[in-house]
UniProtKB/Swiss-Prot annotation:
GO (cellular component) term, any one: polyphosphate kinase complex
Residues reported to bind ATP: N91, Y514, R610, H638
Keyword Chloroplast: no
Annotated Gene3D superfamilies: Endonuclease Chain A (3.30.870.10), Polyphosphate kinase middle domain (3.30.1840.10), Polyphosphate kinase N-terminal domain (1.20.58.310)
Alphabetical keyword list: ATP-binding, Kinase, Magnesium, Metal-binding, Nucleotide-binding, Phosphoprotein, Transferase
Protein name as it appears in the record: Polyphosphate kinase
Cofactors (names): Mg(2+)
Residues at the active site: H481 (phosphohistidine intermediate)
Record-stated family: Belongs to the polyphosphate kinase 1 (PPK1) family.
GO biological process: polyphosphate biosynthetic process
Swiss-Prot/TrEMBL catalytic activity: [phosphate](n) + ATP = [phosphate](n+1) + ADP
Post-translational modification: An intermediate of this reaction is the autophosphorylated ppk in which a phosphate is covalently linked to a histidine residue through a N-P bond.
Length: 736
């Protein structure tokens, strides 16, 4: 599949002219419609006008809705379609735990603050509720009416109670008696048994009872919390249900045998529910003496934050759902009635069935550059030239190998490393431990506040400290999100620096799922800059002048704004001007205003924004030269790439940062140049493969809608990820 050439439009369309945003024959999906902008045609638009901006949370929701749409795409294997549906659930959980919780908190403390779009938090919550209710209903309809029936055709069955045979009922009874009942603790509700404090996102049941117990109590209600250690999906042996993969939901088992938990009482109804709580840590790092100790205390509190959402079975009577809403101090608009398990993310356990490889993506082996294949010593290769890798198409192994070799190399003196998310069984951490034990000076800058990875990071910090490494937790008030490694090695009597800089985390698992760039370099100036940044993080001192590296919160934002302004001036001077940027999110108002000005001046701007985008493209007189697309596919798009035509002297940058205020103003981030015509051309071609994608590309319209791009006429189907997979990796019979 050849998509290496520039888009014809990118070559032929004059940058001074507006190009249409919507291509012909594009499938429009009204379900993801956002509030439309009403923009009068004015000569000098006010770039602070709120109608020029899309609300952040609504844009984030639309990304998740695009993820849900993939569950309907028959070009994906069936179990992968199920994964997309489950990712929608997982993303929605975090959205409520963090974003919705934040909006509710503003209202609670009377601190409502509108963003650039002008929408107040209470208005945003109303729109969020409307959107989410509709798409949660749609999600369960896709599951029940499309995916589960299709899976059944492949002998993957989720057997509902109404279809249980006598043999299956007997097996379920034994399983319930032996594995479930002994560890379940039902709680009757009365004055001495108050409503329990339920853990965030845990599975629970509200039970309506009739009768009087041994103590003469007649409460009428009970709660059954399902222990988290129990699997939510249980596989049934073939001798019970016949051949195939047959599963029963834990919730169905508890429903069927709730009577056994209340001997002598009549169960009138048993209904599953799940509560979502605020999971954002209320930790002010400036007010604590020991961040690690304070964080351990906050992690426990996270499980019991304020309620933000209630999910119940759609068969639950109104008087019971109203009772639950009252217990959790929630409004009826925060109630979600679902036709199926209340926590679909627990179905991830069955998406990798060994018995059905045909229902999953075909395996592949990430490639290793020939230069590294032919050399056992990574240092000898990197000392001669930069090595650029694009994961997962190219392997993350060279990055790990560099650190492993450093750990054993007698000439290596010191290793410095940032860690944001590295996983529980990290090869990177293993190598750092080995390096410390082998007498190297190892310093790890670990970001303890990486959301939902805090506990894992605390554990690896303890492990590194036990090995003798120096561990610090970044800078108070700023998350350390930069991805960088520095190795100091003595060669011919001198200390030589080697560095790794990346757009993604030091996480070998994610490197198989996320697209990210890695640069291995021994460039003197760049490695010196990395050393300076580590000195800033580890010690104290004034801002140090960098030669090549842009870094937040100091020079990165200004550098980006300056480069956008430079392209703007080229366009005003009648010269070709072009910006291509690919990243995860665009929310920073200053960056958006700069892009609007560039568009007005005639700069052609192509943005590939996977997630949130608060900019409205295609507005006459404002953003008519801006095109925004989002790519959703097999791999999570995670690279941050910035290209500037620069009057013909092209510049390319890779970064750990998105164009968001939090990244540019409140985090430690890096942005580094891609140097040399060969590497710049390579990255540019890879960017262009995304701009020509017409199978997994969604185009953002000026009214906030996304429409899916599709091949037109005799146009061949083009997928950026498929092209890069074909070009860079090696398909094989088994994953390695």
């Amino acid at each position: 599949m050849n998509t290496e050439a520039l888009i014809e439009a990118a070559v032929e369309v004059d940058v001074q002219e507006a190009a249409p945003v919507v291509e012909p024959d594009i499938e429009v999906i009204p379900a993801i419609e956002a509030p439309a902008a009403s923009l009068p045609a004015i000569v000098a638009p006010n770039l602070d006008d709120s109608s020029l901006y899309i609300h952040r949370e609504l844009s984030q929701l639309q990304f998740n809705i695009r993820v849900l749409e993939q569950a309907l795409d028959e070009s994906y294997p069936l179990l992968e379609r199920l994964k997309f549906l489950l990712i929608f659930s997982s993303n929605l959980d975090e959205f409520f735990e963090i974003r919705v919780a934040g909006l509710k908190k503003q209202i609670t403390f009377a601190r409502e603050q509108a963003g650039a779009d002008g929408l107040q938090p209470h208005q945003a919550l109303a729109r969020i509720s409307e959107l989410v209710h509709g798409h949660v209903d749609r999600q369960y309809a896709i599951l029940n009416d499309i995916l589960l029936p299709e899976l059944e055709k492949h002998q993957v069955r989720f057997i509902r109670r109404r279809h249980w045979t006598a043999k299956l009922k007997a097996w379920v009874r034994r399983y319930f008696r032996d594995e479930i009942a002994p560890i379940i603790t039902p709680i009757g509700l009365d004055p001495t048994h108050p409503f329990p404090l339920l853990v965030n996102k845990s599975l629970n049941f509200i039970v309506e009872l009739e009768g009087i117990d041994a103590f003469g109590r007649d409460s009428g209600l009970a709660i059954i919390p399902a222990p988290r250690l129990l699997p939510r999906v249980i596989k049934v042996p073939e001798e019970v249900c016949g051949p195939g993969d047959n599963f029963v939901f834990l919730s169905s088992m508890i429903h069927a045998h709730a009577d056994d938990l209340f001997q002598g009482m009549k169960v009138k109804g048993c209904y599953q529910f799940r509560l979502t709580r605020n999971a954002d840590l209320a930790l002010d790092s400036e007010d604590v003496e020991d961040l690690a100790r304070a964080l351990r205390g906050e992690l426990f509190s996270r499980r019991y934050g304020d309620a933000v959402r209630l999910e119940v079975a759609d068969t639950c009577p109104k008087h019971l759902s109203d009772y639950l809403l009252k217990q959790f101090n929630l409004h009826e608009s925060e109630l979600y009635q679902v036709n199926g398990p209340v926590n679909l993310t627990r179905l991830f356990s069955i998406t990798g069935l060994d018995s059905h490889p045909e229902l999953q993506y075909p395996p592949f082996t990430p490639a290793i550059p020939k230069l590294l294949q032919n050399s056992e010593n990574v240092f000898s290769v990197v000392s001669k030239q930069d090595i650029l890798l694009l994961h997962p198409f190219e392997s993350f192994t060279p990055v790990v190998d560099l650190l492993r070799q450093a750990a054993k190399d007698p000439h290596v003196l010191a290793v410095r490393q940032t860690l944001y998310r590295s996983g529980a069984n990290s090869e990177i951490v293993d190598a750092l431990v080995d390096a410390a034990r082998n007498g190297k000076e190892v310093t790890a800058v670990i970001e303890l506040r990486a959301r939902f990875d805090e506990e894992s990071n605390l554990q690896l910090a303890s492990r590194l400290q036990a090995a003798g490494a120096v561990v610090i937790y970044g800078v108070v008030g700023f998350k350390t999100h930069a991805k960088m490694m520095l190795i100091l090695r003595r060669e011919a009597g001198e200390i030589v620096r080697y560095a790794h800089l990346g757009t993604g985390n030091y996480h070998a698992g994610n490197a198989r799922l996320y697209t990210d760039y890695s640069l291995l370099t021994s460039d003197d100036a760049l490695c010196e800059d990395v050393g300076k940044l580590f000195s800033q993080l580890i010690g104290m001192g004034k801002t140090l002048r960098m030669k090549k590296l842009l870094h937040a919160p100091f020079t990165l934002k200004k550098g980006m704004l300056d480069m956008i302004a430079r392209e703007t001036q080229f366009a005003l001077d009648g010269k070709p001007a072009h910006i291509i940027a690919k990243f995860n999110s665009l929310t920073d108002p200053k960056i958006i205003r700069a892009l609007y000005k560039a568009s007005q001046s005639g700069v052609r701007i192509d943005l590939v924004v996977r997630g949130m985008c608060c900019l409205r493209p295609g507005i006459a007189g404002v953003s008519h030269n801006i095109h925004v697309r989002s790519i959703i596919g097999r791999f999570l798009e995670h690279t941050r790439v910035f290209y500037f035509l620069n009057g013909g002297d092209e510049q390319m940058f890779l970064s750990s940062a998105d164009w968001m205020e939090r990244n540019l103003d409140k985090r430690v981030e890096t942005c580094f140049p891609v140097e040399g015509k060969k590497l710049i051309l390579r990255v540019k071609k890879e960017l262009e493969s995304y701009l020509t994608d017409n199978t997994h590309s969604w185009l953002l319209q000026s009214d906030g809608r996304y429409v899916r791009s599709m091949p037109t006429g005799n146009q061949n189907a083009r997928s950026a990820q498929a092209t890069l997979l074909e070009r860079l990796s090696n398909p094989v019979l088994s994953v390695r």
